[in-house]
């Protein structure tokens, strides 16, 4: 039994927490997981169903317009996993030394991606009206960090109640007081003209 433990211990991942700057050792484990050499590591946290609360405004629930139904938050580890899975699908082998620099180019140190799936959007043009960020609390008070970039996945479809699909937001926490193991309060505005500010909480200690 002790001999088996001695073999397994070197392959145990770090304590679970978001890695703002993914290191090579953890990247190797993410790649190994993508090739099924070890169990996959948790590289993202998903919230489904998405529990949303109102921070400001009246008559904001039910949503006066489109509504978010699912969220996913991830960092550099997810990018490494995606690159490794893409290579595997193309029957290629890649090493962490290859994909980690590319992952850091696509999603720099200290950055996160937030995926937000919507339902009931009346016009595709209204996707750009969504504003997402985080609310940070410190002893000096609170501040907001807005996503510096927003894109869309190619999963948009027209349903009976409007369009459904996924927005992707990019956030930069460089130099910000964010606990990689703690809760993160994500805030957003929808396309509605009502002054409604919504929020949901993400556990950064649930993924790498």
Report each predicted region and the residues it spans.
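Sec-dependent N-terminal signal peptides
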Residues: 4-15
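Conserved functional micro-motifs across diverse proteins
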Residues: 18-208
